Amino acid sequence: MITLGIDPGFARCGYAFIEAKNSAYKIVDSGLIETFQNQEYNQRLSFIYTQLDELIKKYKPNNAAIEELFFSKNTKTAIKVAEARGVIILALTLNNIEFQEYKPKEVKSQITGNGNANKDAMMKMVNLFTGSNIIQDDTADAVAIALAHASRNRIFNDIK
């Protein structure tokens, strides 16, 4: 089963496709969708959508998880991230991918056992769980979101 994790952003959107096999997790692909300030606003949103849509069509995830928007002190940034989340959710919906939203503290708690864990602790656990060496924050967050969702799905499936 392939799970897509997304750390939404306007300038940098982290993504990770992970595969759960038995009790192990393998990263199929992960990275960033990056937009740049010299691009028109609508082009940046379109680029996020088209890149994610291509990745979804390539890897055909069974489900997805996306980080909920937390309130930022910078309203302008929060609005841009919210709009990026909108095109991300559109890409998931048009590809018939069911998704779950997670608060950052939920992901941190599930991955590290501490809802207030820092970036270093998160990255360490992500790399431990996947046997990888991810050093980019947004990518690591996307992997963590995918891991949290895949793990939660596994628990619910075991209960059934």
From Swiss-Prot:
Which EC class is this protein assigned?
A: hydrolase
UniProt protein name:
Crossover junction endodeoxyribonuclease RuvC
Name the chemical reaction catalysed here. Answer: Endonucleolytic cleavage at a junction such as a reciprocal single-stranded crossover between two homologous DNA duplexes (Holliday junction)
Residues binding Mg(2+) 1, per UniProt: D7, D138
Report keywords, A-Z. Answer: Cytoplasm, DNA damage, DNA recombination, DNA repair, DNA-binding, Endonuclease, Hydrolase, Magnesium, Metal-binding, Nuclease
Cofactor mode of binding and number, as noted: Binds 2 Mg(2+) ion per subunit.
Per UniProt, subcellular location reads as:
Cytoplasm
Organism (species) = Brachyspira hyodysenteriae (strain ATCC 49526 / WA1)
Which cofactors, by name? Mg(2+)
In its UniProt record, a GO molecular function of this protein is: magnesium ion binding
Q: Which family is this sequence assigned to?
A: Belongs to the RuvC family.
Q: Which residues bind Mg(2+) 2?
A: E67
> Which Pfam families has this protein been placed in?
RuvC
Write the gene name: ruvC
- The residues responsible for catalysis, as annotated, are D7, E67, D138
